[in-house]
Amino acid sequence: MKNNEKVFLLIDTSGSMIENEKRSILKYVYRPFKTIIGDRLLAYSWGDEIKEVSKVSELRMQGKINNETTEKFLNNLEENSHLVIMSDGSFETDIFKKLEKKVNMYFVGIGSDVDKKILEYTFGKNNYFEAYDILNLANWLKREIS
């Protein structure tokens, strides 16, 4: 793997993330993830638009996922990029299935209402992680990009 590889992180900021303390869970799993990956992590808010964020604590949860914006973002990723999605899974999974190039995608389920079966089907059983498993994913990615 290249020494300059980045890990792209999409953080779901849609309105469904307001429910059931998901924002608190998100902050809890983000900190160790950021610490392990370091400056190779590029975090983006993912909702009506996708934009890079520097402080996860300032994210506002509102609106809904914009499929067109998501598709453009995904198509701009380089082949074999590492993409981590932190979400409750309330979005259309077909966008990710349509991706023409190979992108290594991992999903971190946030909240108790995550539909694990659909997400495992979409991203692969080995690419789905519960929030409590974030350290395993982060350490594995660190080895992949080093």
List PLM regions with ranges.
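Short, surface-exposed, polar/charged, turn-prone segments marking secondary-structure boundaries
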Residues: 35-39, 70-73, 110-113, 133-136
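Solvent-exposed polar/charged
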Residues: 35, 76, 121-122
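Short, Lys/Arg-enriched, disordered terminal segments
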Residues: 1-4, 143-146
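Von Willebrand factor
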Residues: 2-55, 70, 79-86
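N-terminal low-hydrophobic presequence detector
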Residues: 33, 40, 62-63, 146
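A short, well-structured beta->alpha microelement
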Residues: 62-75
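VWA/integrin I-like adhesion module and closely mimicked acidic/polar interface patches used
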Residues: 21, 57-65, 89-144
